[in-house]
Regions:
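N-terminal presequence-like segments and the immediate start of the first folded domain
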Residues: 1-65, 69-82, 88-150
Length: 150
């Protein structure tokens, strides 16, 4: 059993890799962006003149929501995250990213590393986050039992 899953209701990965992989009680979430299933991006607006405006706060919030959706598919939640790595195209966006991050996590949340990268797989992306969660098998089975009872 590989434990790897591509989640149909989310944006398809832009390569041959899963959204998530479960190994024992650990859940590994691949780098996740603000991309929607229809291949548009949260946090991208084009004005009437054709100028593209990118919003780090909206993208950060959407990335974290996408990670929450991925974790939910394997019986986890954001509070199960133990480590995240955030990739920013520009450290000039750190303040806006950090502001949204702090709405959801505090010093008791996951450990975090934030790095600047040259670019991400699409020019509209300002941020991508990967993570590791600890979701004991007993919690995952309880979640599956609840879903099956519905």
């Amino acid at each position: 059993m590989s434990g790897a899953q591509v989640i149909e209701k989310l944006a398809k990965p832009r390569g041959k890799f899963p959204h998530v992989k479960v190994v024992g009680d650990f859940v590994y979430v691949s780098g996740t962006s603000s991309r929607r299933p229809d291949n548009t991006f949260v946090g991208v607006e084009v004005d009437e003149m054709g100028t593209t405006v990118l919003d780090i706060r909206a993208q950060t919030r959407a990335v974290i929501e996408n990670i929450a959706a991925i974790l939910a598919e394997v019986g986890g939640e954001l509070s199960d995250l133990v480590q995240v790595t955030s990739y920013l195209v520009s450290m000039n966006d750190f303040g806006g990213y950090n502001e949204v991050y702090a709405e959801l996590f505090d010093e008791n949340g996951p450990t975090r590393t934030t790095v600047a990268v040259h670019q991400l797989p699409h020019p509209h992306l300002l941020i991508e986050i990967s993570g590791v969660a600890y979701v004991p098998a007993s919690k995952r089975s309880a979640s599956e039992d609840t879903e099956n009872a519905s």
